[in-house]
A protein has these predicted regions:
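Mature extracellular or exoplasmic CAP/SCP-family domains and secreted bioactive peptides
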Residues: 2-202
Length: 202
């Protein structure tokens, strides 16, 4: 079997930190429906707004099996990518990581990944050699429509907050990294299954 080659990406940030878990750490828990909705809605807003526009961008939904895998990995506090067998549900999943010494909201974490768009040109890929674009391309990979995320507190690490999102099916295939979606009129590939510019099925 030939396995596709994929990019995996991580981001690290070091703001000021007391080193103690804040009282509201539980507010970031993805066991909470409000956090699940925030993560899904933030992704869908960003996916809906890609430039150039996408004709085949699937609408994201929360996926509990991926969230379980993400939590299991986050709890390891390795601050590195999980092995492929820990990113599998019914399909192989992709993964974005974010590490910081203080807490960040999920919307800020996801936005930090998307901001790599500044270094990306549709049809070309990275604008400059060595530019990191893989977080962005995974966020907007057209058929990565299931997402599960988790965060862990790692008190013995410099980066005490370890955020993990897994995307199913995985994106970032090297062969098409320059075109993470199909350019065209929003919902052009799904005229009968469109929800505000995103496809509910293809």
């Amino acid at each position: 079997m030939i396995l596709p080659v994929v990019f995996l990406c991580l981001t690290a940030v070091v703001p000021l930190s007391t080193g103690e878990e804040p009282e509201d750490f539980d507010a970031l828990s993805t066991n909470r429906t409000d956090q699940q909705n925030l993560i899904v809605d933030t992704h869908n807003t960003l996916r809906r707004g890609v430039k150039p526009t996408a004709s085949n961008m699937l609408k994201m939904e929360w996926y509990a099996p991926a969230a379980k895998n993400a939590q299991n990995w986050a709890n390891q506090c390795t601050l590195s990518h999980s092995p492929a067998n820990m990113r599998r549900t019914s399909v192989q999943c992709g993964e974005n990581l974010f590490m910081s010494s203080g807490p960040f909201s999920w919307s800020d974490v996801i936005q930090s990944w998307y901001n790599e768009e500044e270094d990306f040109e549709y049809g070309t890929g990275a604008k400059t050699q060595g530019a990191v674009i893989g977080h962005y391309t995974q966020v907007v990979w057209y058929n990565s429509y299931q997402i599960g995320c988790a965060v862990a507190f790692c008190p013995n690490r410099t980066y005490k907050y370890f955020y993990v999102c897994q995307y199913c099916p995985m994106g970032n295939l090297i062969s098409s990294i320059q075109t993470p979606y199909k350019n065209g009129e929003p919902c052009g590939d799904c005229p009968d299954a469109c929800d505000d510019g995103l496809c509910t099925k293809l």
